[in-house]
Amino acid sequence: MAMRTRAEKRMRKFLIEQLKTRQQNGARIAQGKKSEHELIKNNLGPQVFVFRNLFSGQVLYSQVPAYHENQINQQFLSPNWQNRKPSRRQDLWKIMCVVNFNNYEYAIAAYKGLVDLRKTRDVVQKKEANEMRKKNDDGNIWYSGQFRPTYTQEAVADLTHVIDEFELEGTKIFWANEWHRGDDKHWRADLVEHDKLPVYDPRHQTVLLDIMREKAIEAFRENNTSEETIENATEPETA
């Protein structure tokens, strides 16, 4: 087995420390809901990040490329043995998709809509929602081990509903696995475009999400510049 040089060991240690710092800073920024002003101030794009729990199949929404314990508490309001409050362990939460919106107003409306739909299903209409879920022979939500795929399916359905209901044109969704998006017939082609997330090392998820953040900001600025150019060109000249 090849021995690592001291320089390689120092570089590896430095990279690990950088990843830990990135995770800690991301979690701090993720705390609490973000207004348009706060998103711009923190150099964040008009996005929603959808994380999937590998152990349970549960889904967590975030306005930033990270998540915080407070978000778990706010989005899992009525935990029970079939829908336990999940741990915030970094190795369990993996990105399912990154959703880029045309502007910050759209992104904030979508995030609120997704969280509100979750609350309606888990608290307000808990009985009705549970009746619609696939059951096993014992009458419980179908599962394999502790994994319940219904939560991922509901999250995708909620995402399609929010985009349709608010008519969020110019939406672009980057999927970690395109299988999760389902059939094209469930998505309006005039509102949303689909793509794949770049291939990445699962251990370096924070790096990927930071790249996606930067790209979203660039796309938003380019789009705004183009719109301003068109508006200026179409304005009538004053005598």
From Swiss-Prot:
Entry keyword set: Mitochondrion, Nucleus, Ribonucleoprotein, Ribosomal protein, Transcription, Transcription regulation
Claim: Transcription is one of the keywords in the record: yes
InterPro entries for this protein: Ribosomal_mL67
GO biological process: mitochondrial genome maintenance
Keyword Amino-acid biosynthesis among record annotations: no
Single GO MF annotation: DNA strand exchange activity
Compartment annotation: Nucleus; Mitochondrion
Primary localisation category: nucleus
UniProt GO cellular component terms: mitochondrion; nucleus; ribonucleoprotein complex; ribosome
Coiled-coil regions, chain positions: none
Biological role: Component of the mitochondrial ribosome (mitoribosome), a dedicated translation machinery responsible for the synthesis of mitochondrial genome-encoded proteins, including at least some of the essential transmembrane subunits of the mitochondrial respiratory chain. The mitoribosomes are attached to the mitochondrial inner membrane and translation products are cotranslationally integrated into the membrane. mL67/MHR1 also has extraribosomal functions, being involved in regulation of mitochondrial DNA recombination, maintenance and repair, and generation of homoplasmic cells.
Family named by the database record: Belongs to the mitochondrion-specific ribosomal protein mL67 family.
Oligomer status and interactors: Component of the mitochondrial large ribosomal subunit (mt-LSU).
Protein name as catalogued: Large ribosomal subunit protein mL67
Gene name linked to the record: MHR1
